[in-house]
From Swiss-Prot:
Protein family: Belongs to the ALG6/ALG8 glucosyltransferase family.
UniProt organism field: Saccharomyces cerevisiae (strain ATCC 204508 / S288c)
Underlying gene: ALG8
Membrane-topology annotation of the record: Multi-pass membrane protein
Involved pathway(s): Protein modification; protein glycosylation
Predominant subcellular localization, coarse grouping: endoplasmic reticulum
Protein name in the entry: Dolichyl pyrophosphate Glc1Man9GlcNAc2 alpha-1,3-glucosyltransferase
Amino acid sequence: MKGDRSRQNMAVTKKAKLKKNDEPKKVLKTAATEKGEGSKRYSLWNFWISTLFLKLLLIPDYFSTDFDVHRNWLAITNKLPISEWYYEHTSQWTLDYPPFFAYFEWFLSQFVPKSVRDDGCLDIVEIGKFGLPTIVFQRLTVIFSEILLFVILQIYINTTKLSERSQSFVVASSIVLSPGFLIIDHIHFQYNGFLFAILIGSIVAAKNKRYILCAVLYTTAICFKHIFLYLAPCYFVFLLRAYVLNVNNFKFKSYKDFLFLIRWANLLKLATVVVGIFTICFLPFAHQMPQVLSRLFPFSRGLTHAYWAPNFWALYSFMDKILTTVMLKLPYVHTFATKFIKPPLIPQNIKEINERLAANNNGSKGLVQDVFFVILPQIPPKLTFILTIFYQVLAVLPLLFDPSFKRFVGSLTLCGLASFLFGWHVHEKAIMLVIIPFTFLVGFDRRLLVPFMLVASAGYVSLYPLLYKGQDFFIKTLYTYVWCIIYFAAFRKTTKISSSVERRIFFLDRLALTYIFSLLPIVTVLQILDEVKWRYSFLQKFEFLGLMIYSVYCSLGIISSWFALSWLYNFDELLWQ
């Protein structure tokens, strides 16, 4: 017995010695890994130089009416006094962005060379008449303003821990090479790279717990592009909980103790910078605020855009089309429906259905005006606002209890999704408001990868109708699918796998992959039909059908991503620890 005990003690001692000897090796291994990570140069400037050639080649390519929009804004801010900027309406492309963007346009107009001025760049006319000099100048302003995006994301990489730097490099490079920025900015024509750089700066500041800087950059972003207001509930709750409220040290004994719940100095600093930035932005227009607000929030434009954004209202509009067709072809379906749903919630008879079709814009004419549904109830702006706020409240509640960066980015993504899916007159380009914050989130856990793949692939493909000319089909399709292949694989390699949870959260991931792979044949068939439709009169009757397929199919992917992320965000506590 004594011999057995002594042998056991010797074995335990030997194990302890081996463990003790292994500890320095582990430390050295960790140090070596970090040294290896630190010795690598995670620079984005190689990407800027390499993509510069592609962007320069795209200068003479197709551009949308947004090009003349921004040309007109250059002219307005350059030629007119500031008091007339938001009143000028010679062109239909009136100034409808916040004042900081107007100041930005004024700044750019100061660098317009004489040859570009002579080309008509700064003429205030109903329809712009310009040539290659104006095109080159405006394209270059987009390219060089986008440098800010590279700078902000390089700061994000450099401020990340060495052990996580490869992951942050994947995140940053996927954003600067985003198909969305290539399609929207460098072909279609806008300044989203520059504008999202400011928003991303606020996200990076939040990650580094620089809360005042976060507030400054987010408020500035709103003053450049008011669509960022959709994210305000998330920023408000995050800054309130992380910077203003002193919850950790709070002990309730009497109601006076609530005074100590608030860090008053922090609240004062936060309020000062936010109010100060809004004052700088809007003070020159204080006497014309109703006019400015009417330009920024034009509710008369209708529920959906001419091309339905791939959201809930696209499915709602599609269902209205299906019901209308079915009831006209099979009148007894209408008779059956009226037994359960009474007018005015449904047309009284087939004659009324035909009258509504003849009289109203039912969403399939490509008109930018108020849309009237034939069968389904009309949707007022108030309802879209209520739905958006409801789902945003659900997104920010967990953030109120856990103001971590991971929760913040998750809440930010869901707030963007809620506004995109249920908002009023949402543009397809607003999907970038979802994809960009989701990119920062996906690296935390591999279970987030499939929802991200869904929203990224469906979101980027939904932008294809912006470039409707056949000459752009190859570039937009090839670039998007190469990006998807590279970065979906890169995220799979660099994202963490939670060892605490082995079950498959997103159990429909194979169905999701089937959906993603189906996008390519769908867009190819639609492009072929678009190219040959002029030969066949029956295809010309269904001119809007291709856009409808884009909207409906892409909305299915984006809504599925929303369901999956919402489930993980609200019910998988281990993922957020």
